[in-house]
């Protein structure tokens, strides 16, 4: 499952594998799991914040840039299976690729270990990481999204 989570579509295309062998479906699932867990986290951490502000804050927390930051902290790029062309053009460091891989990893953790393990991973390596590095945007910054 982990190998599937780090397999980019460029690698699958280059190796003439089935499209389903890349991480895109796991990314889809991981995105949904991340949205649910981050929503729950914000709901309980910001009990007086109105719904619109919670939505903006969540969007800023799970955006490509924030997830890419967390992926860099985990050195996720070094584990990616990329096609030669994608690798040669800096794909390991591209925010869109690393953030997608992080969502795929969340999807894999959810499928393999269940909701509780996915939640533990997200709290430890994404939500707490973002708080510790001041990436949680204020409502003014979220308005700019």
Question: Where do the PLM segments sit?
Answer:
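Double-stranded RNA-binding/processing signature
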Residues: 1-140
């Amino acid at each position: 499952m982990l190998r599937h989570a780090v397999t980019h579509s460029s690698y699958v295309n280059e190796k003439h594998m089935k499209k389903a062998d890349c991480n895109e479906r796991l990314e889809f699932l991981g995105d949904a799991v991340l949205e649910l867990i981050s929503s729950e986290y914000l709901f309980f951490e910001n009990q007086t914040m109105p719904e619109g502000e919670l939505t903006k804050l969540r969007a800023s927390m799970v955006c490509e840039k924030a997830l890419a930051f967390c992926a860099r902290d985990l050195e996720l790029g070094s584990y990616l299976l990329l096609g030669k062309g994608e690798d040669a053009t800096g794909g390991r460091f591209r925010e869109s690729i690393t953030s997608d891989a992080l969502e795929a990893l969340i999807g894999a953790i959810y499928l393999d270990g269940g909701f509780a393990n996915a939640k533990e991973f997200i709290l430890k390596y994404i939500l707490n990481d973002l708080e510790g590095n001041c990436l949680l945007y204020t409502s003014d910054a979220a308005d700019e999204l």
